[in-house]
């Protein structure tokens, strides 16, 4: 089976007309959830994915609300709760130079320009102006590294290694 990537988790239904409430886990929800696009539903107790075509998409509070072709009522989508939406690897778009997908960054080892290993990126937060990488070290403590040019000096996806310049107070 082709490699697939998570783009969202279904947390609930919304209204009575077959909308579902999704927490996006993708870098590009507007692109991933575009009308006409295909996503694959992996339900909690099912091994086989269900192919779904997006009929509508809108933002509501912190959620993405989706409707799928062929689903017109709450009774048809209730079973999807707690399901995960994925896309195939072939659906990924090529990024510009120095742009990366989250799955390429998560798992990379972070080292300083002095060669000190800080740990592995376990999560990426998107609080606002720039992403923040959560780095867990051998001491199990989490360090927050902002993805900005002053800090991140080199990203080598092939070697799964990221070099950073430690600014004063960054690791305190």
Curated annotation (Swiss-Prot):
One Gene Ontology MF term: ribosome binding
GO biological process terms on file: maturation of SSU-rRNA
GO cellular component: cytosol; ribosome
Residues spanning the membrane: none
Record Pfam families: PRC, RimM
Main location: cytoplasm
Keywords from the UniProt entry: Chaperone, Cytoplasm, Ribosome biogenesis, rRNA processing
Subcellular location: Cytoplasm
Domain named PRC barrel: residues: 97-170
Subunit: Binds ribosomal protein uS19.
Known function: An accessory protein needed during the final step in the assembly of 30S ribosomal subunit, possibly for assembly of the head region. Essential for efficient processing of 16S rRNA. May be needed both before and after RbfA during the maturation of 16S rRNA. It has affinity for free ribosomal 30S subunits but not for 70S ribosomes.
Free-text note on domains in this protein's UniProt record: The PRC barrel domain binds ribosomal protein uS19.
UniProt record similarity statement: Belongs to the RimM family.
Protein name, entry field: Ribosome maturation factor RimM
Gene that this sequence comes from: rimM
